[in-house]
Amino acid sequence: MIDKDKYREQIIKASSEIFSRYGFKKTTMEEIARSLRKGKSSIYYYYKSKEEIFEAVIDYEAQVLKSELSAVIKSTDDPERILRRYVKVRMNSFEKLSNYYNAIFSSDLGHFDFIEKQRMKYDRMEEAFIRYILWKGTRSGHFNLKDTGLAALAVHTALKGLELPLFWEKRSYEIEIRLDAIINILFYGIVRK
């Protein structure tokens, strides 16, 4: 007999793949059950609805993203390298965690209360991570910032603005080059000194 928590995790992982393939609207409980080789009733035992499963998938992917970004922040003491890696890992993670990305940025799913809460939670988390990186860099003398909170908000806003062009044009070789160029402008500016 399988452990309840492990079965919940199996449901979440299987559902994640199906939601990312077909989207929330086109995914059915039948497809989720079929992918697990179980009956729908066994899934309804753990989750009351497709919406509840989707919420669990979004929470799961949010935790994956947070873990990956936390690992980047702890990976080195060099704040410039941390910020560079943070931006790249963030963008690559969004591509892998398509359900989370769609939930956070799609207007079609805005009618779910949990989506709006997740959006706000994500924005706060990201601004805090960036603020910490900038604070660490300012404290160590790597960065010259008067207001790390405002700078974090600006970087966060710039990153959000990059998402659409980067993900719509699925040319991954260019993504790295474009991200490096943007990060270099962030670090070195465009004004001659």
Q: How would you describe each model-predicted region?
A:
Residues R21-K25, T76, L97, S140-G141:
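Short coil/turn segments at alpha/beta junctions that flank glycine-rich nucleotide-binding fingerprints
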Residues M1-K6:
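N-terminal intrinsically disordered/low-complexity leader segments
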Residues K50, V57, E61-L65, Y86-R90, ...:
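Hydrophobic/aromatic residues within well-ordered alpha-helical segments
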Residues Q10, I18-E52, A56:
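Helix-turn-helix
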